[in-house]
Regions:
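Sec-dependent signal peptide recognition
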Residues: 2-7
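Surface-exposed, beta-sheet-biased, low-hydrophobicity segments with strongly acidic/polar composition
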Residues: 18-216
Length: 216
């Protein structure tokens, strides 16, 4: 009888240990604010005067960023899955489709950043088909920003959240806060030289779900 009892308790102890070992420890949601991320900064002005000339131009290169690592990725790794999102001027690229070898994608969610607790079940993640289409629509008032030609300023649209699927298939939400150096939009009365010099520096915040779910 004692042998049976001992065997029973040994079984319970083994089962408890097995259950504990099989329990997956969930990682917390990562929240981060990124300041002054240079996105193909201005390197010159085209000859002439607007609209045919006098326009800023960059080197035409993307800045690659890993949402999962929280760090800029060297351009030499642009053909890998080490990056999740890339910036060039106002264009934003995901590691998907013909934009990269990853399982990424994205779409623009209309609503407040704080209110997006779970990605809606009917959401469609778009992938890159550059230059025909972008996962995050490119152009004034088409995606995350509006361009005021009279003031020559780019301003994030309130209530626009970028929902990003990373290169590994995880989910993040991003809010672009500012497009200018130091996170400060130049005054409308500032010179075009100042506006051009200080643009293409992103300030944004994001939350990243490392556990593979769609909830934050």
């Amino acid at each position: 009888m004692k042998k049976i009892i001992y065997t029973f308790f040994a079984f319970l102890l083994f089962a408890a240990c097995t259950k504990e070992n099989n329990t997956t420890k969930l990682e917390p949601v990562v929240s981060l604010t990124v300041n002054n991320l240079a996105a193909d900064t201005i390197i010159g002005i085209t000859p002439g005067v607007p609209p045919l000339g006098g326009m800023p131009y960059g080197a035409g290169k993307y800045t690659f960023y890993s949402i999962e690592k929280g760090a800029v990725v060297p351009s030499s790794d642009s053909a890998t899955t080490k990056w999740d999102i890339a910036f060039r001027g106002t264009a934003i690229l995901t590691n998907s489709g013909n934009g990269g070898p990853g399982a990424g994608g994205g779409f623009v969610y209309v609503g407040l950043f704080e209110d997006l607790k779970t990605v809606p079940s009917d959401s469609t993640f778009r992938t890159e088909n550059v230059p025909t289409s972008y996962a995050i629509p490119f152009g004034s008032n088409k995606g995350w920003y509006v361009y005021d030609g009279l003031k020559n300023l780019v301003t994030p649209i309130p209530g626009r959240v970028l929902v990003i699927r990373t290169a590994s298939g995880k989910i993040a939400k991003i809010e672009i806060l500012n497009y200018y150096k130091g996170g400060v939009t130049p005054a409308a009365t500032a010179s075009d030289n100042v506006k051009m010099k200080d643009q293409r520096y992103y300030t944004f915040r994001y939350s990243y779900q490392p556990n593979g779910t769609k909830s934050f």
